[in-house]
């Protein structure tokens, strides 16, 4: 493939590239929350994920305003922080700083991995109804989000509108966040949601045509029948590449009874008059689609949810309705377990389960009917529900039996030991499966070199001829990923075979295979030459300097100084 370099060599450049399509039998999708880098998530950096186990990684979340202009939730985390170990050598605020850079670097080391941007989420869906309501704002948002992933070199867009037509008031304290936009839904959201997805699909296809690459579009969907009824699945599933059914949080501390929050099947022992949400399960979700749409949708695009985290209750009475599963469908006190995020949701990561069991005196239980794990203390009155390896294996088997598209989990930091992620992988592919790598094609940063002879050698200036075009903060930060010269290395060819040596600001200079090789990246200003910028240095030669003696200058780049070189381009003569 012309100008392609195998990623197994650990080389990468996210300027503009194309990826050959490689078939993998199922999707194994994982969210990564940008706040995972902070102490509240025990500094779970992207490099701590075992990316060899997943096919798609969703960055969560990007926001937008009512006009469809992009809004960063945390610019420092997204684009500026450099203290993550995988960002060694990257300057503050430079391209590939921040979580978005760290995720891109993670992809270098796992060339099969697709990385995407999730927009919205539970607390950032407030402007979706307004944006989706008009052609103008739909198109503006679509252009912006597609431009954003194009600049970053990412692979897909994920729309996480929670939820079309839903009306929910903002509740920052209840959600454990500073900003919760709520969702002012309208009945028209049903149609507008479909139109919004089509607008994004159109822009992705246009970008793909430019870059010779197929970009994916996914959606996160409610598994509640009431919310599912508000989606035109027969139309939506023709637009998107896959739909992630959020078959978790189906029950929780808001209820005055215990129930599974991510069951595969519905255990029918619940009180249908008082426990409405107890009917929800993966199978109930799929049955709804099958009953409503039959063969009018492609079920291989349906991805079902896994929860490596708990929902929990205190004050649980011994009046459970299933004698085979003590504590299930029992009266409980809502919002009674304080979680690490400050809410009363009883939410703890799977990696905290051992500590949780000890703290609350919990024993392991497994509901064979629901194929769901739970943890219960009948004496203390505590009940927690969460996926485990056994329930995940059952979900993987269900995916295969039903011809579905795979599994998705919220979120990586909650499975810090990769136990649930491994179970997901094993259930879909089996132990020992290796994802096939993919090839990338790179395009150049517009660049040139100017040369002047001096008494002992040459004054050389490397010019970045790109221009900054963006004013929106998110796009302005992302634009630098594509348009900057990073960790350059220069190969100077002379007609006379002159030997080159170091001069002012040249960094390391060697002579290899007839070239003078200049690596100035040890100098701060040479690590990143921004659009419109330049970097100047001098080199010495062992003969009389003459411009006519310089045959060519070839430039390569690196994302990190420690990574291999990519994309050789001749920048002199032009």
Please tell me what each predicted stretch does.
Residues 452-459, 535:
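Short, solvent-exposed loop/turn segments enriched in Ser/Thr/Gly
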Residues 67-87, 119, 254, 260-272, ...:
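Glycan-binding loop/region signatures in secreted carbohydrate-active enzymes
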Residues 57, 117, 159, 200, ...:
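Conserved, mostly hydrophobic/aromatic
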Residues 502-545:
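Intrinsically disordered, low-complexity Pro/Gly/Ser/Thr-rich segments with frequent PxxP/GP/PP motifs
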Residues 461-479, 492-494:
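Asparagine-centered strand-capping/turn motif at beta-strand->loop junctions
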Residues 533-574:
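Terminal connector regions
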């Amino acid at each position: 493939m012309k100008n392609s370099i195998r990623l197994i060599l650990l080389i990468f450049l996210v300027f503009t590239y194309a990826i050959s399509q490689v078939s993998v039998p199922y999707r194994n999708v994982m969210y990564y929350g940008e706040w995972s880098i902070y102490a509240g998530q025990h500094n779970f950096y992207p490099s701590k994920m075992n990316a060899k186990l997943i096919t798609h990684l969703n960055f969560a979340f990007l926001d937008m305003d009512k006009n469809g202009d992009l809004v960063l939730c945390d610019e420092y985390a997204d684009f500026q922080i450099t203290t993550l170990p995988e960002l060694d050598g990257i300057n503050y605020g430079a391209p590939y700083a921040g979580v978005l850079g760290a995720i891109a670097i993670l992809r270098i080391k796992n060339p099969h991995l697709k990385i995407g941007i999730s927009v919205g989420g539970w607390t950032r869906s407030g402007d979706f109804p307004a944006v989706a309501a008009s052609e103008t704002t739909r198109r503006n948002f679509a252009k912006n989000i597609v431009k954003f992933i194009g600049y970053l070199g990412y692979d897909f867009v994920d729309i996480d509108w929670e939820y079309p037509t839903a009306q929910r008031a903002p509740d920052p304290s209840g959600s454990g966040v500073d900003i919760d936009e709520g969702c002012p839904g309208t009945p028209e959201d049903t149609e507008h949601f479909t139109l919004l997805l089509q607008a994004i699909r159109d822009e992705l296809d246009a970008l793909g045509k430019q870059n010779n690459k197929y970009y994916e579009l996914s959606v996160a969907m409610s598994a509640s029948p009431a919310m599912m009824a508000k989606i035109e699945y027969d139309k939506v599933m023709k637009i998107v590449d896959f739909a992630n059914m959020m078959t978790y949080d189906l029950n929780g501390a808001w209820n005055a009874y215990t129930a599974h929050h991510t069951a595969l099947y519905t255990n029918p022992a619940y009180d249908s008059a008082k426990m409405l949400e107890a009917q929800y399960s993966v199978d109930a979700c799929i049955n709804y689609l099958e009953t409503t749409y039959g063969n009018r949708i492609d079920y291989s695009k349906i991805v079902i949810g896994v929860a490596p985290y708990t929902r929990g209750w205190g004050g649980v009475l011994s009046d459970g309705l299933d004698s085979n599963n003590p504590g299930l469908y029992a009266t409980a006190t809502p919002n009674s377990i304080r979680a690490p995020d400050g809410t009363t949701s009883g939410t703890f990561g799977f990696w905290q389960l051992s500590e949780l069991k000890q703290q609350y005196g919990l024993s392991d239980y497994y509901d064979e009917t629901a194929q769901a794990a739970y943890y219960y203390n009948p004496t203390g009155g505590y009940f927690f529900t969460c996926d485990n390896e056994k329930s995940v294996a059952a979900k993987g088997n269900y995916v295969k039996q039903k011809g579905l598209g795979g599994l998705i989990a919220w979120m990586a930091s909650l499975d810090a030991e990769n136990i649930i992620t491994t179970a997901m992988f094993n259930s879909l592919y089996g132990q020992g499966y290796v994802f096939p790598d993919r090839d990338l094609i790179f395009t150049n940063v517009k660049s040139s070199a100017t040369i002047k002879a001096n008494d002992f050698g040459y004054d050389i200036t490397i010019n970045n001829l790109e221009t900054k075009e963006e004013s929106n903060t998110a796009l302005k930060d992302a634009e630098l990923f594509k348009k900057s010269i990073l960790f350059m290395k220069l190969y100077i060819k002379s007609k006379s075979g002159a030997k080159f040596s170091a001069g002012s600001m040249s960094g390391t200079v060697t002579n290899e295979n007839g070239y003078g090789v200049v690596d100035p990246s040890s100098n701060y200003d040479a690590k990143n030459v921004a659009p419109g910028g330049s970097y100047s240095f001098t080199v010495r030669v062992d003969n009389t300097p003459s411009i006519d003696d310089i045959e060519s200058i070839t430039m390569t780049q690196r994302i990190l100084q420690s990574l291999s070189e990519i994309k050789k381009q001749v920048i002199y003569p032009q």
